[in-house]
Amino acid sequence: MINYKYGTLPSSQIQKEKKRLQDAIFILLPYKEDNYEFLDAYFISLQQRLCGLNHLFGEQAKILTLMSILESARYETEFSKYRKAILDACALIDEIEFP
């Protein structure tokens, strides 16, 4: 069981959420390549989701780092740098610890 702001959650639920979050970040790659018209709105929605996660699990530094990487990627015009930021963000999800 994992402790959070309002009680506890099963570890399996946390692992599933980490996978969903990685998928939500990874999809930013094809969205950028395809010039998805709602890409900016998607970034905003993802940042709001991360902000909520941060509040629920004790404001961890790695979540702030993740948010910073994504904010940087949001404005990156060079695709190779954008891709690296997105892949770094996906990898960072595995490093987030839940108390």
Identify what each model region corresponds to.
Residues 20-68:
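Amphipathic alpha-helical interaction modules
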Residues 1-38, 86, 90-96:
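Short terminal alpha-helical segments
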Residues 3, 10, 52-55, 71:
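Generic structural signal for short, flexible, solvent-exposed coil/loop and linker residues
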Residues 65-99:
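Amphipathic alpha-helical binding modules
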